[in-house]
Amino acid sequence: MTELNHEFTETLNAAPERVFAAFTDEAQLTSWFAQSADLELREGGAFRFWGRSTWQTPFRWSAHQKVLRLQAPGLLAFSWPLDGLDGLDSEVTLTLVKDEDESAGARTVLKGRHHFPQAPSIDRPLDFVDDLWRIALANLRAYLAGGEVYPPDFSDAAPRVRQAVTIDAPRHKVFHALLNPDALNLWIAAKAVVEPHQEGRYSYGWSYDVRGRTVAGGPTQILEVVENTKLVTDWPDWRGDASRPATRVSWVLEAIGDQTRVTLIHEPFERTTDVSDYPHGWAHFLAGLKQHVESTSTST
């Protein structure tokens, strides 16, 4: 098999020293990246991390990562046997540079490279590694901001996203925000299209670039609709890969007095990494739905 290189750049709202510590302090690393860690911060020292949040490394005895290069607070490189095969190490190199634009406060430009001499022997290896780092970076951003972290669980045979929020408004107002195009455009959509019946069109009007291709992302169709109670839509592959099976997103509304409990369920995913950074994305949109509905309810 051919080699695989995955590169990424992330701007983080923290100084390089703070970000470096998040990777190299055991207590911090286990707060956002892995369940357990055993770190020897020297070249050639152990950089072990393991647990159900680490692919192919559920136990300490299966963790063989090592520090390759270390220069605080700007460089960390470590080996990472990711394929579960002896002798097939991948290598992660992270560089941290202070963002010269100080108008937004202390920030770090994190550049990463994950190199495999041979691509992992799995389906869609590039997508797998990309999603692995989308999960990690989303959790790192949340950790640095004091927000909620959503660690993956590689022991889960049926991975899914489940989020919930309580909105200070009755169900019919929340339901309106899910089915009215003008309302959707205020909190989640760009140019929403809604045919409010089963098998009707349902689009957020999203358009973005993935590896040089333009993708019309988000839902395309209503699968189920129950007035003021439930909305279920399809959710095609976000990278625009038509060969991948679509998932579905369910919005379930429950009346709790004068309030509404909204539960979002996104499923099914074929593998844990396919969940990607959806937990953070859906938490963001649920917060947007709450803010939109409560502000419009107050104004009316």
Model feature map: region roles:
Residues 2-11, 15-127:
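Ordered, small/hydrophobic-rich secondary-structure cores
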Residues 38-82, 193-240:
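Glycine-rich portal/gate segments that line the openings of hydrophobic small-molecule binding cavities
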Residues 7-9, 62-64, 91-93, 162-164, ...:
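Well-ordered beta-strand positions in beta-sheet-rich domains
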Residues 19, 29, 47-49, 67, ...:
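Hydrophobic pocket/interface hotspot
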Residues 144-152, 293-300:
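Short alpha-helical interdomain "coupling" segment at the junction between an upstream regulatory sensor module
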Residues 137-145, 286-294:
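Short amphipathic alpha-helical signal-transduction/dimerization elements
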Residues 1-38, 42, 139-142, 148-193:
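Hydrophobic ligand-binding cavity/cleft-lining segments
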Residues 5, 79-134, 221-224, 234-283:
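Beta-strand/loop substructures that line and gate deep hydrophobic ligand-binding cavities in soluble
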